[in-house]
Design a protein with these regions (language model features):
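Fe-S-dependent hydro-lyases/dehydratases of central metabolism
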Residues: 1-180
Length: 180
């Protein structure tokens, strides 16, 4: 087995058998996908009293669901970066931050071109929080719905989720708590 070039061998690492996650990193963060994973898969559960988070038209691709483009300063992800003292010039893109689930779930449904029929006249990742009727970013609504214990669904039109096999389109939706 190759040990790699000299530069590779000079990289300083912890001598551990398990990766030591850097809690301060905004690029790579330990994902929650395997936390509390049951030994056996859970069966299907009935979804009751769910609210739609988005009602989308036709041709909403994985690029709409999980954008790879620039991160807006005035967004839930921008707020997350401000909390972590990251300057806007260093936000980079969603594509470069795929190793951080906190960034990626905030970016889910945040494509600047996505149109949610629940929030007419808006573009770019907004929804309407019910029963208040307040228009807000999708992630912010999810936080409120989680506090209330509200099940969420997304209603997609023809060819919803088609496109490149971007894993974050599925993972981000799951992390937001969308049931169907």
């Amino acid at each position: 087995i190759s040990e790699g070039p000299k530069q590779w061998q000079e990289i300083k690492t912890d001598n551990t058998s398990i990766y030591n996650w850097d809690a301060k990193s905004t690029y790579v963060k330990k994902p929650p996908f395997f936390d509390n994973l049951p030994d056996e898969p859970e069966g299907f559960k009935e979804i009751k009293d769910a609210r739609p988070l988005l009602i989308l038209g036709d041709m909403v691709t994985t690029d709409h669901i999980s954008p790879a483009g620039n991160i807006e300063k005035e967004s839930p992800t921008g707020n997350y970066f401000m909390e972590h003292q990251i300057l806007p010039k260093n936000y980079n893109s969603y594509g470069s931050r795929r190793g951080n689930h906190e960034v990626m779930m905030r970016g889910t449904f945040a494509n600047i071109r996505i149109k949610n029929e629940m929030a007419p006249g808006t573009e770019g990742g907004f929804t309407k929080l019910y029963p208040e009727g307040k228009v807000m970013p999708v992630y912010d609504a999810v936080v409120e719905y989680k506090k209330r214990g509200t099940n969420l669904i997304v209603i997609g039109g023809k060819e919803y989720g088609t496109g490149s096999s971007r894993d974050w389109a599925a993972k981000g939706t799951k992390l937001l708590g969308v049931k169907a």
